[in-house]
Structures are given as structure tokens and as C-alpha cells.
Amino acid sequence: MRKLEQFAWSNSRFILEALTRRRQPIELTEKTTLKVNQVFANHQRNQAFNEEFGCERLLPSYAFVLGYRFLGQLLLQANIPSKLAGLIHLSSQFTYVSEHDFSKDCDVEVTLTGFRQSSKGILYSFKTVLFQRGIKTLENTNMVLDKSPHYKSNKAKSKGNWEQASYDVIAKLPVTIDTAWRYAKLSGDFNPIHLHKLSAKALGLPNALIHGMYNLHWSLAQLDTSMLKNWQSI
């Protein structure tokens, strides 16, 4: 496994690396891990997150927001064949290891743990691990798809209306492009597939998609906090 240990990049370094990055054939792709020590707590962003989702304390899923910048830092150095714009986030799982205090500094380790070709495109798996005082606190595992332009779904489009289905709806939220831009500024995720229907179509999608993590944060925020009190995995 290729191992990198670095400081957090500046915005100018990110831009430079993004402009000069070259995609590599999948044969050269290898598991890669990036460790960034002493990541300072961002109290302004912490507060903005709580205000956006109406939380009294940060949700476990905030670990994704904290690690997102370093996921980008890893992707810009990993030898992968994919463009970074247009990657589709499929799933995210959070595992509690020990107590994490988001108001304190931490170390972040991000790893490209796996990759494979599929009928839909290239699937990547990533794991983000947070540490405080040398102790592992939270793990976040994510699946990401680089969708093949040649892939066509075999599933017939549903003609039903989800509102007619038998769901126990506890909350609803209208989601707009303004919502997507607001979350992009909060999280740093400016993937074009979320921000306008034209940029989404240019990347092979029929329309813009709200960030999947926005849906997760908002859904968790609607739950009774006692349901998250003794959580082990989400």
C-alpha cells in the first residue's frame, strides 16, 4: 500500500494539483492512504452545520464533512483513471469506536481501500478514520461510482408516485438548487452534478442531484436524539 503523510493543503495547492493532475490507467491504481495530523477544529463550520440542520450537537455524519477535504487531497494523488468531477457518492457508513469531540483538534486518515470495474463503471471504496490523542474514534466508509457513459439501466421507470406508497412520513423538506449551493459552501463539495441541471447533464446525468450526504444529515437530524445516543453504526 502506498502511504502518504502530509499537512492539509492550501486552496492554491488544491487548484494547482487539480490543474496538473493526470489520469492513470486502472492497471496502475493501487491502494493508497493519506494521514493528516493535527487538523484544527473549525468552530465556524461546526456552528453553521448545526444551524443548517437544526441540531444542538454535531451529528455522527459530520465526520464526512470533516474528512471530505482530505478525501479530495487523496484523490488528487491516487493513480486512478477517473475524472474527479462527476463521481457519484453511493453509500456512507459510520462506525463508533470511541468518543469524539468535534470541538477539539484531531488526526485524519483517508484510504482508498478498493476499486473494481463493474457494469455501471468503476466502483471505489474509501475509509476515513478520525483519531484524538492517538485513539481511534470514528470510522466512515464510502462507496463512490465513476459511471460509465455506456451504461444504461435495465429497470423500467416507475410510473407510481412515492407519496401514494405506504410510508410512515415523519418529516418533509423541499430541496432546491439553493439548498445544494448552501450545502456545497458548508461542506466544500462543489461537484457539478449537484449545482445545476446543465452541468449534471454534461456529466451524463438527466438532472442535478442533491448531495446524498445532505439527505443523510437532514434525516438523522429529524430523529429523536435518544435514538442516536447509543449508536454503534449508521
PLM region descriptions:
Residues 1-89, 155, 159-226:
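Hot-dog-fold acyl-thioester-processing enzymes
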Residues 27-55, 96-98, 103, 122, ...:
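Soluble, non-transmembrane catalytic domains of enzymes that act on hydrophobic metabolites at membranes
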Residues 69, 100-104, 110, 135-140, ...:
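Generic hydrophobic/packing signal
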